[in-house]
C-alpha cells in the first residue's frame, strides 16, 4: 500500500482502477466471499434490456440520466417541476432556481441511505417507501422550510438550520412513528448537522460561485472540478471508517483480497449524478468528464448480479448473515458491482444497437435498466420485503 496517497484514494479514477484489480481476482476464482460466473452476464443483459424496452421502446433517447429528480416525481406527480414553474412565474432568475434545486437535491441525496423494509411516506393519497419515499419526504420538508433558518426565504438549505436539526424534527418531517420506523434517523440527522457545520451560514449550492466565479457557464462544468468541491465539503462529515495518514476517507475500505483500500464514494457519486441534471436542464451547461463516474455500488445494482447468479456466496458464507459494510463480503460485492455494471452496459448497448441512434450512457442504463431490474428481481424472489439478497448493517449514512 506504499503507493497510496490520500488524493488518489479520494479521486474518481481510483474507484474503477481498484475495482478492476478485484475483477482480476474474480476471474481466477480468488475472491474470498464469492464465486464468479461471467457466463450468466448475457442472461442479466437480456433481463435488463427487457425492462428498458418495456418502458422506453422506440424512445430510448428520452431516457433521463440517473438522478434524484425522477425520485421527487414518483407516481408521475411533477412535484419538483411544478415548484420550478412556480418560481419561474414569480420571476426568480434561472441561476437562483438552479441553486434551489441543487440545495434540495443535496440534502435529499445525503438522506438517501436505505430506509428499511417497513417505512413509508404518505403524500396525498399515495404512500411511498424506500428511495422515492425519502425523496418526496425531503422535498416536502424543504418546502416547509425545515432546512432554512430564514422564515421569509424557505426555499433554501442553509448551514444554520442544518446545525439545529434534531433527529426528532427530522423524524417528524419524515412521518416516523413506532409503527412507521425509519432506519438510522439519528445517523441521518447527524450527517446533516455535520454538513451544517461545514457550511457555516452558507448554502450547499454556494459551490456554483466557486466553480463559476464570473457567472460565465459557457466553459462547461468539469465533473472533476465538481468532484473536488464535493469531496472537500463532504469528507469531513462522514463517520470515520477508514483513514489513511490521519485523513478520513469516507466510503473507502481496506480489502485484503487486493491488499489495498477500495474506494467507492457512492453517496457522493449519486449526488454528482443528481447535481448534473439541474445544470443541464435549467442552465443548459455542457458537462465534461461525466464518463469518469462509475455505476453505483449499492444493493439494487449489486443485488441484480447476485440474484441472477453472476456472483454466488461461497458455501461457508450465509445469505442469512447481516454483514458489516467493512466486511470483505460487502467490499468485494460492491467492487464487483462497479466493474460488472461497465460490462453490462456494453452487453446492453450491443443488444439494443439496431434500435439506438446512439449508445446508452451508463447514467441512462442505471436509470432505466440495472437499478429498476434489481428492484424487480428482488420483489420477485423476496416478495414480502423486496430487500437485498445480501444483508447489510445500515446506520443511515451509507446505503
From Swiss-Prot:
- Pfam family of this protein, just one? DUF1688
Q: Which Gene Ontology cellular component annotation is one that this UniProt entry carries?
A: cytosol
**Coiled coil regions, renumbered to chain:** none
The superkingdom of the source organism is Eukaryota
GO MF annotations, alphabetized: catalytic activity
Which InterPro entries does the record associate with it?
A: DUF1688
Q: Which PANTHER family match?
A: PROTEIN URG3, PTHR31687
Q: What does the similarity note say?
A: Belongs to the URC4/urg3 family.
Q: This chain belongs to which protein, by name?
A: Protein urg3
- Gene transcribed to yield this protein: urg3
